[in-house]
């Protein structure tokens, strides 16, 4: 229906500090507007600054990485500290406010060497929040339609069309009307409503009036808002975007007054950093800056369909911007997301030997289902993780055979066909596994959070509720790419308190504070689709990362780990135990039984405790048959036992823990033998073909090789061809370069089920067939299809290190890198996106980077750089022509052998 309107709404506003409008609905179609001019900012943190400096300048100092963090936290306030090698916003608030006299910061390392000097931006240039809307006309927004016509949508058929993501229905009605008014009610409702886009909409308006018991979400551009019962929402399209009446008030919100700011580059953020801050004749020094490990998250993603097709709803995996957004919420220096190709399992073998070809005979659900646990979690997710650890085989049941030495998670979407139909799984995380239904939003933040060791409602109200500035557990988030603060409260003014365990946080200027991801929280806006962790949780997350190793191609061991004492990353030895071993029953410690066990196992253990004890332990005579065998005694029982060995009798008392090794003539006593072996990847960060399945060393259950899984980024290990016997269980993989043979355990880890295997091979080797063999008998064979094209991985934060035969320059500003293999040059000049930018050098072990401050490497204006070289060390380098030149902003490049 078309009617004339005599309605007028107006919100005067300015770009940063704006006028606000109070709108009060009087009746359908009639509004009165009371304009209240208010150009003042709304400050979140109004507390008195506390001095953090030593010297004549007194100022409070904060930093912002994934969130704002204080240089010196208040007593009892659990806050994260700086993360190494991640850029940081420096925030300086002088105790005596001075917004005019310029402020500089001089950065020095632990040797007092100057890293650089920056001039800080004045308080008037403090970054905006993500709620700040750009493009608002200086003169304000006049909510008056261009002509007086409107269309009212109030039928079920018309309302049902509003869920079209293009907004085509609303668009069509706006063609001939200045206003479209939409009425929702019980029985006339849709969950999601989309406003259209297009230049022809300039000046058009949409109004929503809700009488529906269910809420709707209105999407407009990259923003969204909830429409609840009794609410009226008003929108106008201005300067190419929709504005909602009321949200413009948020342009006034800012963090605090009198704050000077500057971005510190990532390579400055290392232990030992100290800052000298100067304002006029005043100077203050910040020495004791706590900087922790350069933590790293490696996240694999895979979409699984079990006896049905994959769901194709793994939105996070497909959305590179989502990777970037989640990185902005956690205290790490690097986050890698590796995408696997979807996996469609047309049949499912269980570790019991049961083959499912139609459906799982049991019931499944969001939190239940045999295939959910055994396949999605244990076989696929842990299979991906364990293959990257070089752990070839593990127990067929359970999640305990996962070393979890690296912050490496395998996240999966999965659904399966059960007796009760096709069931979508989700809602769990921990131990390197993330089982997800919805992958954008709090479910992702929550389940990944369990992998960091976070439980539910961590530390109750004091740890799980975002707080106002004067309280502990208060912060704002920071998007270092968008240069925007993320307030810890919602954009809409609802005047709601945030309550937990009978304690409440009052709203800020009507805005409800959020909850932690582990406490029923939710994202604050579409600007970041993940839930902000509280400072309390972030500190726990940071400790998690600081206690994990990282894959490191430049480490002698293939891994590095943070040493809190030396404040450095040091080589870390990742070890696994592949020795065949068994713990003998205390009821079967006769000489003949022990000889039988030693013939089959490399290590035989005897473990006694109260209630599990026997008097005598008989060991067979050392001989050629048992040369190299290991016996380990761990006696924790209160009664003594007697060990008959080497023709003697030995008393074994409580606390005795030793090993004996046969040299063929004697059993030699020694400290407990560590049979673990170090594992170092052979290739780092390469496309991988991951092979998983089940095998039965006893040959009674049906072994099974699953279809290959293909990932864009993984780690491979050398095969075991040199130390395998034909009788050993093994996975044989045929490739273009020959056959690879990987050792598997020769005994069941669980007595009643098969073992599982999980092995990576380089996709580049073009594997064509996999064969399971035990005792020289073929258990199963699988033809392997070629890997699909287009698999990708993303890196957010610190760039990956250069490969062995590669030289790179990395933009200090963006973190993007430009790399060339040995023997290549940039051409006449570097690409436009990096030429002339300040960079640092990163070259591989066999590479040297040649840079010139001139095009085409001309006039011998060339400097040589090896390894990691920071910009400060590139500013005065002796060139081939004998001059000392600045190569920190190069124009051309070549990579040669070192």
Curated annotation (Swiss-Prot):
Pfam families: Crystall_4, Peptidase_M66, StcE_b-sandwich, TagA. Binds 1 zinc ion per subunit. Does not contain structural calcium, which is often associated with other metalloproteases. It is found in: Secreted. Keywords: Hydrolase, Metal-binding, Metalloprotease, Plasmid, Protease, Secreted, Signal, Virulence, Zinc. Optimum temperature is 37-42 degrees Celsius. Active from 4 to 55 degrees Celsius. Inactive above 60 degrees Celsius. Residues 1-35 form the signal peptide. Optimum pH is 6.5-7.0. Active from pH 6.1 to 9.0. GO terms for cellular component: extracellular region. GO terms for biological process: proteolysis. Induction: Up-regulated by the LEE (locus of enterocyte effacement)-encoded regulator ler. Residues 296-551 form the Peptidase M66 domain. GO terms for molecular function: metal ion binding; metalloendopeptidase activity. Is resistant to proteolytic degradation by trypsin, chymotrypsin, human and bacterial elastase, but not by the fungal protease proteinase K. This is Metalloprotease StcE. It comes from Escherichia coli O157:H7. The gene is stcE.
